Amino acid sequence: MKERSTELVEGFRHSVPYINAHRGKTFVIMLGGEAIAHENFTNIINDIGLLHSLGIRLVVVYGARPQIEQNLADHHYEPVYHKHTRVTDNKTLELVKQSAGLLQLDITARLSMNLNNTPLQGANINVVSGNFIIAQPLGVDDGVDYCHSGKIRRIDEHAINRQLDNGAIVLIGPVAVSVTGESFNLAFEDVATQLAIKLQAEKLIGFCSTQGVQDKDGKILSEVFLNQAPELIKELEVKGDYYSGTVCFLRSAIKACRRGVRRSHLLSYQADGSLLQELFSRDGIGTQIVMESAEQIRRANINDIGGILELIRPLEQQGILVRRSREQLEREIDKFIIIERDNLTIACAALYPYPEEKIGEMACLAVNPKYRSSLRGEVLLNRIAEHAKQLGLEKLFVLTTRSIHWFQERGFEPAELSMLPIQKQVLYNYQRRSKILMLNLEPQPGFT
């Protein structure tokens, strides 16, 4: 008898909303030369093929920096840089074209073949390259001529979209031609960024040697806001990581995010399956750079009742929360705030004000177990406290049987039953014997 894999079933169920959400969207994928040279590149290619089979419009932009460096070394030619940008003279240009051309052929071959020995065996993938980008020279800076190092003059987004509409993967490298027929060496990060902006891509995806951006303790930051990214870049540059994949990608993500690309993702090219885990799971595996959080804290409405019930039922069964019926929730839904992540309610809390006594009760604080290691409970507490102050309340109380220390660590102090509003005193459950804790609220401007 075959064994059932519940993990596979659950994983597939959780991925379905993302499959539907991503279908028909445009993703720009940045593949640096380091990623292409790594042994895991075959798996990345297979996963790119899988994305294509799911109806995602893909533009793959590749770089060749380490391959160019090796080619220069093999020809005993010393690379020249000015302000961290390669000076591409005639000899260097020939070697750049050689390296980039070989990679284009290799990537095209890998994407075009039938992907034997993979779940996509027999799939037909068309890969298209062309003169979609017109370049121009960087020119002269501080007396240094960049020669054939260039930048983008314009992008033919209509031609690219035609190919994407026809079901092709568009492959673009770091060499482009000018209106005069000259070839120029471009920074592939700039190419990917400008393409994502011009194509109004849903996502810009990059790869580096680590699984995203790390904090000072070495932990992966699952989310970085746009206003945080510049400081992270400075910290990495101080360490001498000017050319690291992380720094280059962060620079690109900032530009893309400011120009309308909703999310940028940074993943490890060393970890098998990182691309799929990032795109088809709620929490991902790398770092995403966003204008605003993927999570939303807001007032609950009648459509949120199902999600709240699903969140609080386990806690009610354990006796941690007082049981609430659907009918009660419907009557009191305006008292609740929730934290929502990708249409899933992951945390909730309620405020029951007693205006005459200038006091309020914080109740039904619940956080999904997968998200309890973060500060979401504290975020809800702060939001409830702010709302209470806006209502002119001076105190906030809770009744709790299990979270006494958590509230005390946040300023709550033991209180007597007689300190509660009369209505609450009458309803106090002597069988539960909940502890009463109270917090003095700082006065909100406008209230005395």
From Swiss-Prot:
Q: Tell me which EC number(s) this protein carries.
A: 2.3.1.1
Provide the N-acetyltransferase domain boundaries: 295-433
Q: Name one GO biological process term.
A: L-arginine biosynthetic process
Q: How does it assemble?
A: Homohexamer.
Identify the Gene3D superfamilies for this entry.
3.40.630.30, Acetylglutamate kinase-like
Q: Which InterPro entries match?
A: AceGlu_kinase-like_sf, Acyl_CoA_acyltransferase, Asp/Glu/Uridylate_kinase, GNAT_dom, NAGS_kin, NH2A_AcTrfase
Question: Which UniProt key words apply to this protein?
Answer: Acyltransferase, Amino-acid biosynthesis, Arginine biosynthesis, Cytoplasm, Transferase
Q: Disulphide bridges in this chain?
A: none
Q: Which Pfam families match?
A: AA_kinase, Acetyltransf_1
Q: What is this protein called?
A: Amino-acid acetyltransferase
What GO CC annotations are associated with the protein?
Answer: cytoplasm
**GO molecular function: any one?**
L-glutamate N-acetyltransferase activity
Catalytic activity, reaction form: L-glutamate + acetyl-CoA = N-acetyl-L-glutamate + CoA + H(+)
Family as reported in the entry's similarity comment? Belongs to the acetyltransferase family. ArgA subfamily.
Compartment list? Cytoplasm
Pathway the protein contributes to = Amino-acid biosynthesis; L-arginine biosynthesis; N(2)-acetyl-L-ornithine from L-glutamate: step 1/4
